[in-house]
Design a protein with these regions (language model features):
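Signature aromatic-anchored transmembrane alpha helix within multi-pass, membrane-resident enzymes
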Residues: 100, 121-128, 238-271
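Transmembrane catalytic cores of multi-pass membrane glycosyltransferases
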Residues: 31, 44, 89-193, 200-203
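Membrane-interface transmembrane helices that cradle and orient dolichyl/undecaprenyl
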Residues: 53-74
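Membrane-interface alpha helices of multi-pass inner-membrane proteins
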Residues: 72-89, 99-100, 125
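Transmembrane alpha-helical segments
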Residues: 29-30, 86, 90-91, 253-286, ...
Length: 420
């Protein structure tokens, strides 16, 4: 609401309320800002998107305005610092957002406000020491080039929704076009221009993905400005335009009809729909209850015993979340390649082989037997091993016995004299 007050001072309450409505409507995609803003509020990145991102735009606009004070500058610096602790990517996203906010308010700058300009620029470099430290510490680590870069068009649709992105696009375009105030027009247009012309530019996206964001999280360039507030501003301006011009021209009627049609198409895929896996709870677990029970059972099977626990990713990832848990062969198979330089070729190859073994992508054989023993595996979680006779035979030969069958998983255990 504070950012709404800065964008549209005379209609800030309507803009804030419209933003809340769009949060409830635009939740089709798992990556959607609406999902992060409301449904996943217990995550740090959700707090960044819902609070810190609009705060950066609000505080930048307020500080650069004639009524800006040193208190606004201090809070802007605090927002950049807070972003560092909320999410790994917000270390990049917050300076990107700050740059967009600074450029969208450039007409407020004059000879007397040069000091303000350089102060805002300074806040953009707050995360720089941390970024340099991360870069230096990752030297010699596994390359992320194995991941393919998502196409910008795919990023756009996967974040805004495969059906809802048309509605959002119309609102984001309508805002700058219909805004009568020059400052409002710039505040809506420039962050969007940066997103489309630079961050989602098909010519630049491979470079940005590889050297700035890394391919797995390239889609988070969409976190560079508050999309929902900008879309809400566009909606408010469309309604105002239609109300003023509809009786005299056909275009306002057509625009209003298109917006209402796209809204009607979007509503069935709202944020609170049942297939979005919504549960009303405080900091609810973002995991399958069945998988959680399997993880608990696997941990209890090893209680008081030595050795490592081997499980598929969906189970081992949950086991790793427990404050006290057995030593895992892998928390997530994705990390094997990342940590290979630190583990050594033989160790990482054994872990990769065992991951394939419990995931059903690698055949049983002498190499698997050797890996089970070299890594001192005491407990194994498998998908219904009764349908995999070779797997069952191998585990039995290696002195494992099936102790539990839970939700389609079998838990095998053997006693080891000591841990590796």
């Amino acid at each position: 609401f504070l950012y709404s007050q800065e964008l549209m001072p005379r209609r800030w309450l309507l803009l804030g309320a419209t933003t809340l409505v769009l949060i409830l409507v635009l939740g089709e995609a798992h990556r959607a800002p609406a999902n992060f803003t409301f449904v996943r509020m217990f995550q740090g990145k959700a707090i960044y998107l819902s609070a810190i991102l609009p705060a950066i735009f609000y505080l930048t606009a307020r500080y650069l305005s004639p009524r800006g004070t040193s208190a606004d500058a201090f809070l802007l610096a605090c927002a950049q610092i807070t972003a560092i602790g909320l999410s790994n990517f917000s270390i990049l996203a917050a300076p990107m957002a700050g740059a967009g906010a600074l450029l969208s308010n450039y007409i407020l700058l004059n000879q007397q406000s040069k000091r303000k300009f350089w102060y805002v620029v300074a806040t953009l470099s707050i995360a720089l020491p941390y970024l340099i430290a991360v870069m230096l510490s990752s030297q010699g680590g596994a390359s992320l080039s194995q991941f393919e870069t998502e196409l910008p068009a795919t990023v756009w649709k996967s974040v805004l929704g495969w059906r809802q992105h048309y509605f959002v696009a119309v609102l984001l375009l309508a805002g700058p076009i219909l805004a009568a105030d020059k400052l409002l027009r710039l505040r809506l247009a420039i962050p969007m221009l940066l997103l489309l012309a630079i961050y989602l530019n098909p010519l630049l996206s491979p470079l940005i993905s590889r050297f700035v964001t890394t391919p797995p999280v390239y889609w988070r360039v969409m976190w560079s400005f508050p999309l929902l507030v900008a879309a809400a501003a566009g909606f408010c301006l469309v309604i105002e335009y239609v109300r003023e011009k509809a009786t005299r021209r056909i275009f306002p009627m057509m625009l209003g009809t298109v917006v209402l049609f796209l809204l009607a198409v979007s509503i069935p895929f709202h944020t609170l729909r049942q297939d979005n896996d919504i549960r009303w709870d405080f900091a609810a677990k973002k995991i399958s209850p069945d998988d959680y029970e399997v993880a608990q059972t696997a941990i209890s099977a090893m209680e008081g015993n030595t050795g490592r626990l081997l499980a598929p990713d969906e189970i081992s990832g949950i086991v790793a979340m427990f404050e006290t848990h057995p030593v895992l062969v892998n928390a997530r198979s994705l990390y094997i390649g990342f940590l290979a330089p630190a583990m050594g070729e033989e160790d990482s190859a054994a872990r990769q082989l065992l991951h394939g073994f419990v995931s059903g992508t690698a055949e049983s054989g002498p190499a698997v037997r050797a890996a089970l023993n070299s890594l001192s595996v005491a407990t194994v979680v498998t998908h219904g091993s009764s349908q995999q006779p070779e797997l069952e035979l191998l585990l039995t030969d290696e002195r494992f016995r099936r102790t539990h069958a839970v939700h389609g998983y079998d838990i095998w255990h053997r006693n080891l004299p000591s841990s590796r």
